[in-house]
């Protein structure tokens, strides 16, 4: 099949399937692609091609993720599906595949299970704003409407418990397998599901519209002109002669003006999200800015040293530690471009973290750096990644 041209006229949204093992996430992903392919909006995919998810690396961690894309009449979607539970946890915590919304898949025959709860909690912690529910396998409960209603109530109360709007969340009933097999009644449910995703999950704020932030990777001096900081623009855009703050490692950010912007040795009028750019900073000494700091729109981000985080400790087979760690553990926390040493405090009643655990804890860094809720980091020992984390709440 010829490659579809990327159509920028449609809004782009990133979504993913989440839910308990064997509740039908991958079958649903295949069903969505297959049903939409009949309208020429996607390439049909079978279960096996999605299930054979390729490995990718994010923050030094290997994750298996399948990425597929499709369109509805309204939008263009990038959809991520992970084969294993640990892949979900790693994916969410590293932010490898950003999710603007989730499709929570729950089997009507089982109802919510432990990983259903875990994925809802994790989605809340890493900032997935909304989800739509697909109640799968209802074909196995024909005539048992009361049972289906009970499961639906259970899902709504679970969503509310974790801070989602359980009452307003759309719940679509269907059978992913029957839709994949071409049953017209169940294909219609997939169309209903995508209508709900189109209408209930909001279009995210474009990276360009967010406040400017560049993570400093390198600093050098140009004789007679001043100090240049280079790095990747994470978000927003910046015009020449704009003010920025140098944030991180000091209690108070330092303000400066950008007098020149360079990319690939060419002068630019502006830098925007995704660019690798060099910014010439007025009146800044080479020692005033270093790798690991950020240049940001004044007032948009402040340095912090203490926060709550959701973390995943890698298993031994994943290159992680061979032994648990305890509450006096002091690894390096790698944010954007640099390592900062810090300590961890466990929640009450927890004595240790085993390789493979997913846990919430408090981190206190030895020097403040630019972080906000949702900032991702790696946990490292001597340059080796042993875990990943996401900031869930700022404390200091």
Swiss-Prot record:
InterPro entries (UniProt xref): EF-Tu_GTP-bd, EF-Tu_GTPase, EFTu-like_2, EFTU_2, G_TR_CS, P-loop_NTPase, Small_GTP-bd, T_Tr_GTP-bd_dom
Which stretches does the entry tag as region G1?
19-26
Chief location bin: cytoplasm
**According to the UniProt record, what class of enzyme is this?**
hydrolase
Domain tr-type G intervals = 10-205
Highest taxon of the source?
Bacteria
The UniProt entry, under Pfam families, shows: GTP_EFTU, GTP_EFTU_D2, GTP_EFTU_D3
Q: Name one GO molecular function term.
A: GTPase activity
Residues engaged in binding Mg(2+): 26
Q: What does this protein do?
A: GTP hydrolase that promotes the GTP-dependent binding of aminoacyl-tRNA to the A-site of ribosomes during protein biosynthesis.
* Subunit and interaction comment: Monomer.
Say which family it is in. Belongs to the TRAFAC class translation factor GTPase superfamily. Classic translation factor GTPase family. EF-Tu/EF-1A subfamily.
Its recorded name reads: Elongation factor Tu
Q: What is the gene called?
A: tuf
